[in-house]
Amino acid sequence: MENFICKIANEEEMKIKWDYEIEISDNKSNWIIWKDENIDRFKKGLIIPYYGLLDGKIICEATAMLNSEIVQNSDGLVGNGVVYLSAFRTNKEYQGKGYFSKLFKFMIEDLKEKGYEKVTLGVEPEEIKNKKIYNHYGFNEHIKNSKEVYPDGTEIEVEYYGKSLK
């Protein structure tokens, strides 16, 4: 892990990572929209993209969403010292090696330093592995269940959880 660094991404790094996600995706249309939305949100200061780089290559990411207007079902998930986390992704060949855990700790410390008191996230009910990981990270407070809609109209069920940073 000595060549692994955690950082807040810049716009150029975001473009590289989003292009990678588009390239490996089966449904490119959603990913193209999400790329444009997130780069615009970054420019407006509405998100903080956290990246993990190994030997200069982006291998994992997470995004803190700071504004209720950009989070679906945002009531109780973002605002007043609460930030919504999304886009937890690690390139397949680096999964299970502790890289994302290091990035997650970096992100949480940065958000604490910025004054946030709670973080929230959403997970699909059938994503049992992810739910166990999030529980391990301390997301034990069930907030609510709801539906989210992708740009192409696909609806998904989502369970929302919170973690105190105090």
Where are each of the predicted segments found?
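Conserved beta-strand-loop-alpha-helix junction that forms the acyl-donor binding cleft
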Residues: 121-131, 148-152
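Conserved GNAT acetyl-CoA-binding A-motif
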Residues: 111-123
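Conserved active-site alpha-helix within GNAT-family acetyltransferase domains
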Residues: 101, 126-143
